[in-house]
Amino acid sequence: PGLAQADSHPVLCVSWNDARAYAQWLSKRTGKRYRLPTESEWEYAARAGSVTARYWGDDPVQACRFANVADQSRFQTWGFGQKHECTDGHYFTAPAGGYSPNRFGLYDMLGNVWEWTEDCWNASYAGAPAVATAWLSGDCAQRVSRGGSWSTVPRYARSAARNKNPADHRDNLTGFRLARTFE
């Protein structure tokens, strides 16, 4: 991916197609149903019952306690760009689970890597389907990722931030987490 990674770091450089293929492989291998979360499931999990911009509150200065984002470490390394006014010690990805979890006990819901969701891209989330249902209409050549990454500037390090990329796009900012369906 062009940056140092260890087994404890999140997976990078996987497309939406790759992430779905992995979920299908894991489902077949384990006999359990794994999949990408829907956009609404992802946001529900990220917010963890909060109504603030970020699951830790509205203050972006607190980001370095909860997320690996564009901060002083990144700015000091590259010398340019917007940044959070804190230092998390990582200028690229950080080991998974290295920051405080949200109220649901989930780690890294903001920052570190953008996470693919099942949904097709729609410019606005207004009119989206019911919770736990993927939005399968709109621009399905583009897929939604959520959560921001290690290069996310303060205004995008929030639970409602959305991004889009082609389903076959790979970069060192994007990875995934899986959801499991219980039957």
Question: What do these predicted ranges mean?
Answer:
Residues 1-161, 170:
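Functional-site microenvironments in short loops/helix caps that host divalent-cation chemistry
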Residues 164-165:
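Short, positively biased Gly/Pro-containing turn/loop motifs at secondary-structure boundaries
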Residues 172-183:
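Short, structured beta-strand segments at or near domain termini in extracellular proteins/domains
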